[in-house]
Curated annotation (Swiss-Prot):
Functional summary from the UniProt entry: The enzyme cleaves Lys-Arg and Arg-Ser bonds. It activates, in a reciprocal reaction, factor XII after its binding to a negatively charged surface. It also releases bradykinin from HMW kininogen and may also play a role in the renin-angiotensin system by converting prorenin into renin.
Subcellular location: Secreted
GO cellular component: a single term: extracellular region
Gene: KLKB1
GO biological process annotation, one example: blood coagulation
Organism for this UniProt entry: Bos taurus
Protein name in the entry: Plasma kallikrein
């Protein structure tokens, strides 16, 4: 099995551009050629983020400060494209290379929380103030409309005049114009993209209205909503004006003008027929239409022009969009319905691209439909949050890939054995129950297995993850059973496959959804005095109110940090060995990690529901603890 997986991986890496999510970072490797852009970034992870959001970038190489004697190339981030999906590899000490995350679903986020000690990220300094910490400086940057990144001089900075000074910065690209090593300073980026800004946002769309002010770019778009998304992800755009296809000036039709101003606000709008204006949504606190970096709408009787990447014949415009999404270089497409372009039920699907990711021209009134690739959608090709559904008593055997976030936590002492379950929530993070680590806090005794169905298939050749750090919730107490939650940081990022993916976290900001399709999974006992099961078990189970649950546990306190599930008559429940595993529920075609298997009286007893840690109550804690990870920050 492991040999087959490795073979598939190398075929994917070297032979095609239509593979799934590749998260590996290659140390001491530099990709030669294919350059489409270059900038300065503080680390390889931020370079990867820049590659992910660049319309042409598939690969990148990063040169840390100690990897080159050329001062102009230190902290250099080189974004690359390739027709074949790969580039020649050159051995270079210290260099780090990797792939765009365009195909990585839930990992696509512009949020980057890390604060870097000992480097000065240079740009245009436009504001200076005294603060007490780098975190406070980052907060000021996040709440300043123009600030993109910052540098904070600590209380031990060599110049007394600048100690505890917070410098807010910006640049045309949104990245530093240079990065220098400097003692006693800390630098980082605005957290606007993390939903942390207090500025607020305006979702108004102003019909027949144009903003003047300063144009920073002009990009072709089919409507004002695509224009708004483009503005949201442009480093300098604060608001926009879009001219429709009926605009009086031919050269400006379907052009999205991205704008800024010194004040941060537009001047008074000018009444203009066939002009539509609005604001960037970067400072919004919640996920709204336009804040996701993709466009799913299909435009009938519209043709998008651009560089021809590939032509194929498919059935239906949805099939054309799916084909475009699967081919990672494809940015947009046109599906022709002209009789001469059809062969039976299949018609011509033209896959296209451009330098900026937008059509070079748009034609209306044609027998065609057009749209964009969904490669940057959070529910994109990796299907992390939309996977078919995917201590279990009364359960049945699961199938391969049905619950790809489920992991087995195993302890290796005299013999190795399954102890708890857990859930993958990020490429370097697993969420489980705190009580799994009672008396077992040494990270080197644990092995974590993902992408497995049968425990008997684990051999000495089976790949596993090691633990870098165990983070138990600070309020967890063994004797009380509350706050039964722990994070595991893995030594190395996981490579997501059809058998191994992450589950989405619930949003603490959303109105409480009514979950009607909930499941528990695990390898635990199928009866109270049973044994660990070989095949992963699953059981469909209803949620019950905390008030109802409290009636069943009069000697215990059911807190708001807990959630209960089970049948009144019993029969299905989690049991020994399922602890730490997931309680997942489907809502609006998305699977969420609603609970963590925690405790209960016996297993599947009548009127004794299972008690689970309520994950929504801990989202802030999870984000706080994962923000300094070297993987993409978790964001919901």
């Amino acid at each position: 099995m492991i040999a087959l997986r490795q073979a598939a991986y190398f075929i994917c890496l070297f032979a095609t551009v239509s593979c799934g999510c590749l998260t590996q970072l290659y140390h001491n490797i530099f990709f030669r050629g294919g350059d489409v852009s270059a900038m300065y970034t503080p680390d390889a992870q931020y370079c990867q983020l820049m590659c992910t959001f660049h319309p042409r970038c598939l690969l990148f190489s990063f040169l840390p400060e100690n990897s080159t004697s050329d001062a102009d190339k230190r902290f250099g981030c080189f974004l690359k494209d390739s027709v074949t999906g790969t580039l020649p590899r050159v051995s270079r000490t210290g260099a780090i290379s990797g792939h765009s995350l365009k195909r990585c679903g839930h990992q696509i986020s512009a949020c980057h929380r890390s604060i870097y000690k000992g480097i000065d990220m240079r740009g245009v300094n436009f504001n200076a103030s005294k603060v007490r910490s780098a975190k406070e400086c980052q907060e000021r940057c996040t709440n300043n409309i123009h600030c993109q990144f910052f540098t904070y001089a600590t209380k031990t900075f060599f110049s007394a005049e600048y100690r505890n000074t917070c410098l807010l910065k910006r640049s045309p690209q949104g990245t530093p114009t240079r990065i220098k090593v400097l003692s006693d300073v800390e630098s980082g980026f605005s957290l606007k993209a993390c939903g942390n800004s207090k500025i607020g946002c305006r979702v108004d769309i102003f019909q027949h209205s144009a903003f003047s002010d300063v144009d920073v770019a002009g990009i072709i778009a089919p409507d004002a909503f695509v224009c708004r998304t483009i503005c949201t992800y442009h480093p300098s755009c604060l608001f926009f004006t879009f001219y429709t296809n009926a605009w009086k000036t031919d050269s400006q039709r379907n052009v999205c003008f991205l704008k800024t101003s010194q004040s941060g606000s537009p001047s008074s709008p000018t009444p203009q027929e066939n002009a539509i204006s609005g604001y960037s949504l970067l400072t919004c606190k919640q996920t709204l239409p336009g804040t996701e970096p993709c466009h799913s709408k299909i435009y009938p009787q519209v043709a998008f022009e651009g560089e021809e990447l590939h032509v194929t014949f498919v059935k239906g415009v949805d099939g054309c969009q799916e084909t475009c999404t699967k081919m990672i270089r494809c940015q947009f497409f046109t599906y022709s319905l002209f009789p001469e372009d059809c062969r039976g039920e299949k018609c011509k699907c033209s896959l296209r691209l451009s330098l900026d990711g937008s059509p070079t021209n748009i034609t209306y009134g044609t027998q065609a439909s057009s749209g964009y690739s969904l490669r940057l959608c959070k529910r994109g090709d990796s299907r992390v949050c939309t996977t078919k559904r995917t201590r279990i008593v009364g359960g049945t055997n699961a199938s391969w890939g049905e619950w790809p976030w489920q992991v087995s936590l195993q302890v290796k002492q005299r013999a190795q054995s399954h102890l708890c379950g857990g859930s993958i929530i990020g490429r370097q993070w697993v969420l489980t129950a705190a009580h799994c680590f009672d008396g077992l806090l040494l990270s080197n005794i644990w092995r974590i297995y993902g992408g497995i169905l049968n425990l008997s298939e684990i051999t000495t050749e089976t790949s596993f993850s090691q633990i870098k750090e165990i983070i138990v919730h600070p309020n967890y107490k063994i004797s009380e059973g509350s706050h039964d939650i722990a994070l595991i940081k893995l030594e190395a990022p996981l490579n997501f496959t059809d058998l191994q993916k992450a589950i989405c976290l619930p949003s603490k900001d959303d109105t409480k959804p009514v979950y009607t399709d909930c499941w528990i999974t695990g390898w635990g006992f199928t009866e109270e005095k049973g044994k660990i099961q070989n095949t992963l078990q699953k059981a469909n189970i209803p949620l019950i109110s905390n008030e109802e649950c409290q009636k069943s546990y009069r000697d215990y306190k059911i807190t708001k940090q807990m959630i209960c599930a089970g049948y009144k008559e019993g029969g299905k429940d989690a049991c020994k060995g399922d602890s730490g595993g997931p309680l997942v529920c489907q809502h609006e075609e998305t699977w969420h990690l609603v609970g963590i298997t925690s405790w209960g009286e016996g297993c599947a007893r009548r009127e004794q529901p299972g008690v689970y840690t309520k994950v929504a109550e801990y989202v802030d804690w999870i984000l706080e603890k994962t923000q300094d990870s070297h993987g993409q920050p978790l964001r919901k």
